[in-house]
Design a protein with these regions (language model features):
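Juxtamembrane helix-loop boundaries in multi-pass membrane proteins
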Residues: 1-21, 55-82, 102, 118-145, ...
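Membrane-embedded alpha-helices and immediately adjacent juxtamembrane helical segments
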Residues: 21, 29, 38-44, 175, ...
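Helix-coil boundary and interhelical linker segments in multi-pass alpha-helical membrane proteins
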Residues: 22-31, 84-97, 145-157, 205-216, ...
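Membrane helical hairpin/interfacial module
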Residues: 25-90, 99
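Structural signature of hydrophobic alpha-helical transmembrane segments
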Residues: 31-44, 94-110, 154-168, 214-226, ...
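Membrane-water interface of transmembrane alpha-helices
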Residues: 41-52, 108-116, 167-174, 229-233
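Hydrophobic, ordered structural segments
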Residues: 78-88, 95-119, 144, 156-163, ...
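Generic multipass alpha-helical transmembrane bundles of integral membrane proteins
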Residues: 104, 133-228, 233-234
Length: 315
């Protein structure tokens, strides 16, 4: 059966799957590989769609919502290098591609951020602001999370510092927008991206800075968990809505929040009770990613629903 076109926001699911695989890596290398394979297959489908329907891609990118979410396409590339390093580092040719791919993703995400900023900040409108602006402007911090793969720890450290400052600037603007112009019901899942930036900074800090300061780790983790539970409280209501590709917004934020907790605990030496919280967060992230993944498979097989979303996305 022929699969329907993949909307650009599909990259959010790819990122979520890759992040989940790395989150589960210590538990099972097989699960890590399975997540990577599914992510790669969906990424290939997305890439083929982008090439074949390039004009439609340009139309979708005219939407500030879709364009801000598309940052996850480049973020997926960063995480993809960790899979190449894990499973193919012994193959000389593939190993030689890891750092160039990492650099290409860095250039890509910076270029996308600059183009978006020129387009939407020059004539700023609060109505063009979406929660996924946090991903757009802070997503580059994932360079620090993957710094061990490229070896560019200094760049990773700069992105962590930038990510924290940018989060402090962007989040208040996002909340102001949500108060002045509440999101339409159909795109409310995008709200879940609010918990991503501080979690990404927290998860990245202990990786990019080998000698992480415990006090800073506590501050970052506390902020990350506060926004995480802010979203978790809303999650049951958000999940009641009919499935839409915007559900991809649920995946990476929950995964990176669990990753932030996982990365921070060894540094903080907290009591074992915190491992119970980690288990719950990992389990929840796994369930949500699986649900969204299944939803996408069904979506790709239903042309009517797919065409409706693409029309809305290009508006």
């Amino acid at each position: 059966m022929r699969l329907q076109k993949a909307p650009l926001v599909t990259s959010g699911l790819v990122l979520g799957l890759l992040g989940l695989g790395n989150l589960l890596k210590d538990l099972s290398l097989t699960l890590n590989a399975v997540c990577g394979i599914f992510a790669f297959l969906i990424w290939i489908h997305l890439l083929c769609t982008m090439i074949k329907y390039f004009n439609n891609v340009k139309e979708q990118l005219n939407s500030p919502l879709v364009s801000s979410v598309f940052t996850t396409f480049f973020m997926s590339g960063f995480l993809g290098t960790t899979y190449l390093n894990t499973f193919f580092s012994n193959i000389t040719f593939i190993n030689s591609l890891i750092t160039p791919i990492w650099i290409l993703c860095l250039v890509g995400i910076m270029t996308h951020m600059i183009i978006f900023s020129i387009k939407y900040l020059k004539d700023f409108s609060l109505e063009n602001v979406y929660p996924s602006w946090t991903v757009l402007f802070i997503g580059i911090a994932i360079a620090g999370l993957t710094a061990p793969v490229s070896g560019y720890f200094f760049i990773g450290q700069l992105t962590v510092i930038y990510g924290f400052v940018a989060t402090c600037i962007v989040l208040p603007i996002v909340f102001k927008r949500l108060k002045a112009f509440p999101l339409q019901t159909s795109i409310k899942p995008n709200t879940s991206t609010i918990c991503a930036p501080f979690s990404l900074v927290a998860a990245t800090y202990v990786i990019a800075f080998p000698k992480a300061n415990a006090f800073i780790v506590i501050i970052f983790l506390l902020l990350a968990q506060i926004f995480y539970f802010y979203i978790i409280i809303q999650l049951p209501k958000l999940l009641k809505e009919p499935f839409s590709p915007v559900f991809s917004a649920f995946t990476f934020p929950l995964v990176i929040s669990a990753t932030a907790l996982k990365n921070s605990l060894p540094v903080l030496m907290f009591p074992d009770i915190w491992k119970g919280l980690l288990f719950i967060e990992v389990l929840l992230a796994t369930v949500i990613v699986l649900r969204v993944f299944i939803g996408y498979l069904r979506f790709f097989l239903k042309k009517e629903n797919q065409d409706k979303f693409l029309r809305n996305a290009s508006q």
